[in-house]
């Protein structure tokens, strides 16, 4: 045997031994050798690899020192979004969560088992293993897109570069938290002070800052640890049936999980766990800011599903935020994207939960009045959720004699325009009343540089038009120099205008122009979100685009039509309608389209939306006093058409014999339709329903005309030709409902590579199964 062969065998044995010792130390918390012996083995391996560099492999324990520095982090698209959790701040919140879980399962279930884990205060990450090898690490980012931090996560000592044991799937995505233990944090800050460097405010900031170092050698020198709490992709093996058994399986594969993991048999056990760990919180080796409870059965998790950004089956019960006393030195007013004038408290700096707090949100003037706060007061400040500083109350007995009231400026502090108090319109049962709102607003709109800057920052953000490289500093320059006076002006910027700006050169100017050009083809949903319509977030924009299908329909839609969308209430509907009635907004939209913005993914009205209108619902949405949903339905059945209802309202004899209506309702119906404006408005709504294809007379044709109408389909595994979302959208466009679990009512399951329990369930129930090739063939046939 040659020296190289002998060295290769010894290196392999050393790596195996060291990996086993790491597993016992970091995962089992049961080291089997003294530190000196571990160091001897590690140093022997380093020496052998130095002698035989051709035998060095990326998964070797010696390779955690970090490689070459990066110029920037790449982006990683999460195939399965990394969602955030809903929060509970009181026992009643947790009890409500438990009640909603039981109700959502809809089986008469009264007691649910939950997994319990401390909520670590670190940075959420995704670790991707292929064939047992760590191939990628990524931050959570916005939940859909994160940053590639593979080089940095490889330096974290307790993250296995290769999975332990056997039986792991071909593709395994582990999700968890990278954090810095308190002892390591204190040692890191002590070294920084010793070397005259900058210290970190708390372990969370230290962990986040360490992971975002472009030089992985710096990260390698930081005392970081990982704790797994769940999975994303899991392909090529059967997923365990419960969350706790899943975590134990991850532990067997060498991935650290919380040593505080427990199973609660009921919500009362959850409360007991929360109280117990809260009492031990300060004695833990790491910072936690609450407890995470998850429905333990994974099939129940799938059945309960998700909201837009949070699961129905998990919740984070936060610990009370830490509070301190300080002095209110003054109040400044900031101007937001919509012109809202927001009071911000300037405080005498104070340490709260390890962070120096000098500012706090006062939200609005109603909050100022509720607190009764005056400048000069001693106040209790806390970091709500351990993040956002808030003033909780005034210590009245410490109020100084020269305390001054907080007054709203009459002119905008930025542009000098008038400041007006918003008027709230309360609508209901055919009436509208005005009252003063809590918000004061600058009337300057885009003539106000503060509003313009914030509007453009929102317009170019990642979830909106996604113009890379156009940050707040550059937006400020563009606005301050007068180059940009509306979002549409971005699309007529020239190289000559950019290259003379501070911080710009030839390359950066060309890069920005290229990024602007690349944003010219946004999806309809992104464009709607980018416009910054008040109260229209990303999810509402997606619903508008998916349901109405075109900008023209969205612009024309009446509030009473918009409220047919799920989760769009009347107030939001009126905000949308008002936005598109505003001539200035229409001018900006027109300029954007004229300057080359081409909307993608526009199409027909979605079948699901087209099938939701009825005469009874229309009458109910008119808010006729005295006529609720049941009465509206009976009235619709009796009359049969809107014109018949209008006629009936004036036909006293026939109206008196109409069943299901009280005398009060009959009188209200007569009075409502006696007003010409009400008749005109009702006809306008019906006309728009006809125009959009939502009218009850066209409802049946819309539904029956779709080949998969009434069918429930399930997608499982990985589709190679499209994403799962694209597959879902194509099925829904054909009338199908796409569900997350298989039942006897499922019409068909589309199974790609890595399909697991859903495919097995389909086999048990005799549900039809299509592979991707057959699925594509069916789509081509039905879509042609």
UniProtKB/Swiss-Prot annotation:
Q: Which residue intervals define the domain BRCT in the entry?
A: 703-784
Q: Which SUPFAM superfamilies match?
A: BRCT domain, DNA ligase/mRNA capping enzyme, catalytic domain, Nucleic acid-binding proteins, RuvA domain 2-like
EC?
6.5.1.2
Report the PANTHER family cross-referenced here. CHROMOSOME TRANSMISSION FIDELITY FACTOR 18, DNA LIGASE
Q: Which CDD domains match?
A: BRCT_DNA_ligase_like, LIGANc
Q: Which reaction does it catalyse?
A: NAD(+) + (deoxyribonucleotide)n-3'-hydroxyl + 5'-phospho-(deoxyribonucleotide)m = (deoxyribonucleotide)n+m + AMP + beta-nicotinamide D-nucleotide
For this protein, the record's InterPro entries field holds: BRCT_dom (IPR001357), BRCT_dom_sf (IPR036420), DisA/LigA_HHH (IPR041663), DNA_ligase (IPR001679), DNA_ligase_AS (IPR018239), DNA_ligase_CS (IPR033136), DNAligase_adenylation (IPR013839), DNAligase_N (IPR013840)
Active site (catalytic residues): 119 (n6-amp-lysine intermediate)
Q: Which GO terms describe its molecular function?
A: DNA binding; DNA ligase (NAD+) activity; metal ion binding
Q: List the disulfide bonds.
A: none
Q: Which residues form the signal peptide?
A: none
- For the ligand (Zn(2+)), the binding residues are 412, 415, 442, 448
Per the record, what is one GO cellular component?
Answer: cytosol
Q: In which family does this protein belong, per the annotation?
A: Belongs to the NAD-dependent DNA ligase family. LigA subfamily.
Gene Ontology BP, a term: DNA replication
Source species, please?
A: Azotobacter vinelandii (strain DJ / ATCC BAA-1303)
Obligatory cofactor(s): Mg(2+); Mn(2+)
Q: Which residues bind NAD(+)?
A: 35-39, 84-85, 117, 140, 177, 294, 318
One Pfam family, short name please? Answer: HHH_2
Q: What protein am I looking at?
A: DNA ligase
Keywords (alphabetical) are:
DNA damage, DNA repair, DNA replication, Ligase, Magnesium, Manganese, Metal-binding, NAD, Zinc
């Amino acid at each position: 045997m040659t020296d190289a062969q002998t060295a290769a065998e010894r290196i392999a044995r050393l790596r195996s031994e060291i990996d086993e010792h790491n597993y016992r130390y970091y995962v089992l918390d049961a080291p089997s050798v003294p530190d000196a012996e571990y160091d001897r083995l590690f140093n022997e391996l380093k020496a052998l690899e130095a002698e035989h560099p051709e035998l060095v492999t990326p998964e070797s324990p010696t390779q955690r020192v970090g490689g070459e520095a990066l110029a920037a982090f790449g982006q990683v698209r999460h195939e399965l979004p990394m969602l955030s959790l809903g929060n509970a701040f009181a026992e009643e919140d947790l009890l409500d969560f438990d009640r909603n879980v039981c109700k959502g399962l809809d089986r008469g279930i009264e007691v649910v088992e939950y997994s319990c884990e401390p909520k670590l205060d670190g940075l959420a990450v995704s670790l991707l293993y292929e064939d047992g090898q760590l191939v990628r690490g990524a931050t959570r980012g916005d939940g859909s897109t994160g940053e590639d931090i593979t080089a940095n996560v490889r330096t974290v000592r307790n993250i296995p570069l290769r999975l332990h044991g056997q039986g792991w799937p071909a593709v395994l995505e582990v999700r968890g938290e990278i954090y810095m233990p308190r002892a390591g944090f204190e040692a890191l800050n002590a070294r920084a002070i010793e070397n005259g460097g900058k210290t970190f405010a708390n372990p969370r900031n230290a962990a986040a800052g360490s992971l975002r170092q472009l030089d992985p050698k710096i990260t390698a020198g930081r005392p970081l640890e990982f704790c797994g709490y769940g999975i994303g992709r899991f392909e090529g093996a059967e997923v365990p049936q419960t969350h706790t058994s899943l975590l134990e399986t991850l532990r067997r594969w060498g991935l650290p999980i919380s040593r505080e993991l427990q199973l609660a048999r009921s919500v009362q056990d959850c409360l007991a766990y929360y109280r117990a760990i809260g009492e031990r919180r300060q004695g833990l080796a790491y910072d936690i800011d609450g407890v995470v409870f998850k429905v333990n059965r994974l099939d129940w998790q799938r059945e309960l599903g998700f909201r837009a950004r949070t699961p129905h089956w998990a919740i984070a019960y936060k610990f009370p935020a830490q509070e301190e006393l300080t002095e209110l030195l003054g109040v400044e007013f900031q101007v937001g994207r919509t012109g809202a004038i927001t009071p911000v408290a300037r405080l005498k700096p104070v340490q709260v939960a390890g962070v120096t707090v000098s500012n706090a949100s006062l939200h609005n003037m109603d909050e100022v009045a509720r607190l009764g706060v005056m400048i000069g007061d001693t106040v209790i400040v806390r970091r709500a959720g351990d993040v956002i500083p808030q003033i909780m109350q005034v210590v009245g007995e410490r109020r100084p004699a020269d305390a001054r009231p907080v007054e709203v400026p009459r002119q905008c502090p930025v542009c000098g325009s008038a400041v007006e108090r918003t008027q709230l319109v309360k609508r209901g049962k055919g009436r509208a009343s005005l009252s003063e709102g809590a918000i004061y607003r600058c009337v300057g709109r885009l003539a106000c540089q503060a509003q313009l800057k914030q509007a453009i920052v929102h317009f170019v953000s990642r979830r909106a038009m996604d113009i890379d490289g156009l940050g707040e500093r550059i937006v400020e320059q563009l606005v301050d120099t007068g180059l940009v006076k509306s979002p549409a002006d971005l699309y007529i910027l020239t190289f000559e205008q950019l290259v003379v700006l501070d911080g710009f050169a030839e390359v950066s100017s060309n890069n920005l122009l290229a990024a602007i050009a690349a944003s010219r083809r946004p999806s309809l949903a992104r464009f709607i979100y980018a416009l910054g319509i008040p109260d229209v977030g990303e999810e509402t924009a997606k619903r508008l685009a998916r349901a109405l299908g075109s900008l023209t329909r969205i612009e024309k839609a009446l509030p009473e039509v918009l409220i047919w969308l799920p989760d769009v209430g009347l107030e939001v509907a009126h905000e949308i309608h008002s936005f598109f009635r505003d001539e200035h907004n229409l001018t900006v939209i027109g300029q954007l389209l004229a300057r080359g913005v081409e909307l993608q993914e526009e199409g027909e009205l979605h079948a699901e939306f087209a099938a939701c209108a009825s005469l009874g619902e229309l009458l109910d949405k008119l808010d006729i006093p005295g006529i609720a949903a049941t009465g509206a339905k009976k009235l619709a059945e009796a009359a049969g058409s809107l014109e018949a209802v209008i006629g009936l309202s004036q036909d006293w004899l026939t109206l008196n014999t109409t069943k299901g209506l009280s005398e009060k309702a009959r009188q209200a119906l007569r009075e409502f339709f006696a007003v010409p404006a009400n008749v005109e408005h009702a006809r306008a709504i019906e006309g728009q329903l006809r125009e959009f294809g939502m009218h009850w007379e066209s409802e049946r044709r819309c539904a029956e005309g779709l080949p998969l109408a009434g069918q429930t389909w399930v997608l499982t595994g990985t589709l190679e030709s499209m994403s799962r979302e694209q597959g879902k959208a194509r099925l829904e466009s054909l009338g199908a409902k796409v569900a997350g679990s298989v039942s006897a009512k499922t019409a068909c399951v589309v199974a790609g590579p890595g399909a697991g329990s859903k495919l097995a369930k389909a086999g048990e129930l005799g549900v039809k199964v299509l592979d991707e090739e057959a699925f594509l063939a069916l789509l081509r046939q039905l879509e042609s």
